[in-house]
Design a protein with these regions (language model features):
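Short gly/pro/ser/thr-enriched loop/turn and capping motifs at secondary-structure boundaries
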Residues: 116-119, 151, 169-171, 195
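Aromatic (tryptophan-biased) beta-strands that constitute blades/sheets of beta-rich domains
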Residues: 7-57, 103-123, 159-168, 210-216
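Short loop/turn segments that connect beta-strands within beta-propeller blades
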Residues: 99-103, 154-157, 206-208
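Hydrophobic/aromatic beta-strand positions that recur at structurally equivalent sites within the blades
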Residues: 41-44, 97, 153-154, 204
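Repeat-blade elements of multi-bladed beta-propeller folds
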Residues: 23-27, 62-93, 123-150, 174-198
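Boundary at the C-terminal end of the N-terminal hydrophobic targeting segment
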Residues: 2-6
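Hydrophobic small-molecule pocket/channel-lining residues, especially in calycin-type beta-barrels
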Residues: 85, 98-104, 125
């Protein structure tokens, strides 16, 4: 991890956002436009689209996260995606695929947190047990779990770089949104108003997961 540590995360992400062949963040850019400037698909040929390949998540129920496509992850173009959380035994599985051959992607690694999981998060989740994806910068894929963990993984290996516990299902708090990265910080909120959870937003340093601030 840390392949871009000499560069502010904003510079790194803006450079990626300027490349139409990448989908480097939730919503693609800081404005969350969700707009691609690719022009290969047109109104003239859209009716000829066919499925090229598929990758299963082994998780039923809601899927709302956008896969990220990131160039130069250890010299490879990689796709990162996160599943929903139908149960704690199969909750928020991250998969990383090598897109060097875009017609025949290969899974490089997968990750699921195995310890300290909280099954009570499943019935407390509002609007289904979905996950809305993750963010990438400084060689790390950062995402959150339904039961309240914010996790940074090494983009090349899938190994944990840091893990913090942020939301607590016993207090009605669950996480479905993707964390956002800006100015070398990771930002995350949570849901829980249906259970009268007291809201807050927190920021952690991207490098090591140390807490930068919390706002209630």
């Amino acid at each position: 991890a840390g392949q871009a540590s000499a560069m502010n995360s904003d510079e790194e992400q803006l450079k990626r956002m300027a490349d139409p062949d990448q989908w480097p963040a939730p919503g693609r850019d800081f404005q969350l436009t969700r707009h691609s400037t690719l022009s290969d698909i047109t109104t003239d040929n859209v009716n000829k689209l066919q499925m090229s390949w598929a990758q299963g998540t082994n998780a039923l129920r809601g899927h709302e996260g956008q896969p990220l496509v990131i160039k130069d992850v250890g010299g490879k173009t990689m796709l990162f995606m996160v599943s929903g959380c139908p149960s704690m035994s199969n909750c928020n599985v991250v998969q990383a695929l090598d897109l060097s051959d875009p017609d025949n992607p290969k899974q490089v690694w997968s990750y699921v947190k195995k310890t300290d999981r909280d099954e009570s998060a499943v019935p407390r989740a509002c609007c289904d047990t979905v996950n809305r994806g993750g963010s990438y910068a400084d060689g790390k894929f950062v995402y959150s779990t339904l039961d309240g963990f914010v996790i940074a993984l090494d983009g090349q290996t899938g190994k944990e770089v840091w893990v913090v516990k942020y939301a607590y299902p016993e207090k009605g708090e669950t996480i479905t949104p993707a964390p956002l990265i800006a100015n070398n910080l990771v930002f995350q909120g949570f849901g829980g108003d249906e259970f009268a959870a007291r809201g807050r937003v927190a920021a952690w340093n991207l490098a090591d997961g140390s807490e930068a601030w919390v706002c209630h």
